[in-house]
Amino acid sequence: MYKRQGEESGFKITPQQLENTINQSTKWFILNSPSNPTGSCYTKNELLELANVLKKYPHVNIMTDDLYEHLIYDNNEFHTFASIAPELKERTLTLNGVSKAYAMTGWRIGYAGGNASLIKAMGKLQSQSTSNPTSISQAAAVEALNGDNSFIAERAKVFKGRRDFLINELNSMNGITCRVPEGAFYVFPSCKGVIGKIDESNNKISNDEEFTTCLLYTSPSPRD
């Protein structure tokens, strides 16, 4: 079950919303922080409040996607769920990989930490569906994780500069607003202010899809 969030909540679920959503059929609570595509990042206190709710429901497991853990900006800090709620460790599956922080998307390497029986079952299923990642990908991932990681902070600084530029430009546009993301490398602007306006072709913009169509343009080739 998806629980929609908006700008007013920072695109983050509240403890009360989580509790109201859980029922006997709920199997997993899936959390992505920092988030794709909003860039929202949960604080330690926010995670603790969610953990307090989940303690009441032993039939619900927790899956956390920590792929953007190294891409955090300003004074925000990353906290993984299993570390701030160790009493829920046996019910928590932590997912991560080298795609984002290490710019290794094509190497297709991810990893997980969790209950031993669950990890074993995951390995059995994965080995029969996609076989195994290549040896060179595995060796490269080990080197990335164990090697000099100083470049990560340098890259995060570059991403922050791009974020700041985009936020400034987006918020200077009539009808567009965009909150400042705490992490990852996305911005998630709202185009509510342009709905109902007339585009350059004298057509009324009725929804977000029509607005994105207005943004498309054709770029001639150099030979033209």
Locations of regions flagged by a protein language model:
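Flexible low-complexity scaffold tracts in large eukaryotic assembly proteins
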Residues: M1, S33-N36
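Conserved small/polar residues in nucleotide/adenosyl-binding loops
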Residues: M1-Q5, Y217-D224
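Active-site pre-lysine segment of PLP-dependent enzymes
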Residues: E8-S25, P37-H59, Y68-M104
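Short beta-strand segments
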Residues: I30-N32, M63-D66, N96, R108, ...
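A general structural signal for well-ordered alpha-helical segments in protein cores
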Residues: L47, F78, I119, S137-Q138, ...
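Conserved core segment of the aminotransferase class I/II
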Residues: A85-K160, D164-M173, T177
